[in-house]
Structure formats: structure tokens, C-alpha cells
Amino acid sequence: MSKGKVLLVLYEGGKHAEEQEKLLGCIENELGIRNFIEEQGYELVTTIDKDPEPTSTVDRELKDAEIVITTPFFPAYISRNRIAEAPNLKLCVTAGVGSDHVDLEAANERKITVTEVTGSNVVSVAEHVMATILVLIRNYNGGHQ
């Protein structure tokens, strides 16, 4: 018997997930946390089915989940209605930054902790900006055509 349920809502990586194990944010690679979660005695349920509310897999599984983890680019919207239907929910985690997909007022009323992985993409954002600057300065797109 498990201690509780962790619900993971991620996008489908398809062939890219098979080719690249480091593509962690997809359902195939499950943020790389399945073994850890199960070793702690929890059940991990992973889905891409987050809409429509209230008939999705998220709605069915959230009813008895203690933790929900989602990403900022494929978020499961944790609305007041979903929170009301999830009496065991204690923690909403964004595997990235931002929490605008969680009804913070409803979470606060229920004393549900809402957290994110602040700083997780600082380096990659800086790298992207530098690469974009180089593309623009060197007229890469014009030269490529």
C-alpha cells in the first residue's frame, strides 16, 4: 500500500523522448523521478490528459492525490474547482518557474503549498539570449537563405 499519490502532468515527447533521455519534461521520461518517488513509498501517476475540466485524467486522479507536478509550458490548470475536489492535495509543484496556472487564493485557503523550481533555467535563458544576439549581429538568417 502506498503512502499517497503523486500526479505528474507532462507533454508527450514521442520519438524525441526515445532519442534523448535528457528530455525530462515529457511523460516518457517523467522528470527522471519515478524510481525516487516509488522508493519513498508513493504511487506515481503520469498523464498528458489535462482537459477538459472536469472529465480529464487529471480530474480523476487529482481526487486522491497529495502532490501534483506540472510544467509551465504544458500546465495543468489547478483551479478552485479542482482544488475543492482534491481533499488530500498538499503540494502543487511547477517543474520550472511560474505559478499562474494555480489558483493561489484557493490554494492558500486550503493551506496547499505552491512551489516552483526558481532559478532552474537561468543558464539556459542566458545562453538563448546570447545565441539570439549572435544570430542578429551576424545576420545568420539572411546568410542562411
Swiss-Prot record:
Q: Which Gene3D superfamilies match?
A: NAD(P)-binding Rossmann-like Domain
- A molecular function GO annotation: oxidoreductase activity, acting on the CH-OH group of donors, NAD or NADP as acceptor
Membrane-crossing segments per the record: none
Residues where substrate binds: 97, 121
Q: Which domain of life is it from?
A: Eukaryota
Per the record, the similarity remark reads:
Belongs to the D-isomer specific 2-hydroxyacid dehydrogenase family. FDH subfamily.
In its UniProt entry, what is this protein called?
A: Putative uncharacterized protein YPL276W
